[in-house]
């Protein structure tokens, strides 16, 4: 039982972290954004007009900043080697900006309606249990012994 002094102390509550939006909601928000507004692919520090002037191409990332974010160190030779490859990948993603999504209906998975297409999760009994037990190399009733997966020493 709490004392009178302890019950008089206000209880602190932790603020709940903001909930992340689902991927579908994020996609819908991006889809609703008009093409005339600031494009979502503009990198910070680059004006939207400069990005739009690049004929829809994405700006290649700053390689030292990217390496720092990935927690890797690159020598100048490695940076020289990877720069064209990264530029090529960024160009591939830049081509996605030309895809017309206005006529595409949103769906959770390709080829399905926006709904639950999964079967009901209910237990089913397996009728041929003996066939499984016969094919198992090591069986100790009621357990099936399997080799160790993690090598903990």
Curated annotation (Swiss-Prot):
Highest taxon of source: Eukaryota
Natural source organism: Oryza sativa subsp. indica
Residue ranges the record marks as coiled coil: none
Protein's name according to its UniProt entry: Glutamyl-tRNA(Gln) amidotransferase subunit C, chloroplastic/mitochondrial
HAMAP family in UniProt: GatC
Gene: GATC
NCBIfam families assigned: gatC (TIGR00135)
Gene Ontology biological-process annotations: glutaminyl-tRNAGln biosynthesis via transamidation; mitochondrial translation; regulation of translational fidelity
Pfam families: GatC (PF02686)
